[in-house]
């Protein structure tokens, strides 16, 4: 079983990280090409392109300038511990055991606009480059054109290494679009998280993001290998609703106490 998740805009390169045997990101040749494109953009260009403040644009221009193909523990940190958005709040990597992190290294991948696909212990440098960014590059008008089949093939290789042909899609639509589903040879399960608010079950973005992280944590902590085991997920008060689910879309519901 392989789970895929999105990265996060919020990063943590300050707090202490446990000592794990780190790995190198696989697609730095591609990353370097994107960095070269980004370095040609002014902070004003970045602000417009990414719809971010001047302050954030300046920070990211500096990050692009400082980025280097050489990744070590002085300029990088493992991706699993660098991302700190809503999904990663649910995942709570800092509290995972060493065995859990080792399991995650084989069973979890993070999609990335800059790095393509990251293993949890792959080193990464601070950056902001969302997959949906319309960054013109030598291969096309955006990052989907740039990555082409590269991410899809890497995901398939990771699935093949599991031997059970199961992909759990916990990524956002923006990032999952970089995976060409028609080319994936696996049973793809998409968990959907619905919260009951004012008498109606619906997707509430903040809660859904955190729930995707919780599901990721559940897979990692229980070392899941079977599809049916996903239905036992109960973290955060969610429960599997078989009546609303299909063979490939697993619906989990929760009642919010106001």
Swiss-Prot record:
It comes from the Bacteria. Signal peptide: none annotated. It holds the Pfam family H2O2_YaaD. InterPro entries: YaaA. GO terms for biological process: response to hydroperoxide. Coiled coil: none annotated. GO terms for cellular component: cytosol. Belongs to the UPF0246 family. This is UPF0246 protein CGSHiEE_07045.
